[in-house]
Amino acid sequence: YVTALMRLMGYDNLIHTYTANDIFVDIPKDAEYKDSVSLAFALGILKDDYNGYFRPNSPIKYNDAIRLAVRALGYGEQAELNGGNPNGYTWVASMLKFPCKTADTPDTLKCDIARLFFRCTEVSQKEPVKWASDYVVYAKEGRTILEQADIISDEGVVTANYISNLKESAATDRETVKIDNVLYNIGTTKASDLLGCKV
């Protein structure tokens, strides 16, 4: 989970250049996720919440996943000021409109993490502006992960593809579709197969 979260936040390049420290006693020295965990710890995303143990073989609890996501987006201080773990983080997660678990089970399902990560891409991220040995200062204003990657997220009806057009006579080329009459590149999506559908 930590490695995926760090990649989602755009720290891929930092992960490979960061020198891992022996912060947690239960992480093997040759573990492929060790650098991600060390970087997350250095950025204040991951803290020593379990007395020196990372518990790499235990499934992540949804409350822990939310807590790490809240910290990664820069809202950890706000959560701590509102009661810390778990109430402060639950309050911030609610404010950020994080999804609830899909099933009432003790385990966190992959679909829960996928929905949480998708919501993280839409939340305004507070960007770190200052690091110290025991804290990180975040900017008040930030951009979403989607904005940082220049990805447009919108909903609408596919009104034209390369075969037909619902509103005009001309179709588009094979690499584009019109959604509500706005031309978009389809990229790796199957949008051209969804003429007349809401996407």
Give residue spans per PLM region.
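Flexible glycine-rich surface loops and low-complexity tracts that mediate binding to linear polymers
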Residues: 112, 116-118, 191-199
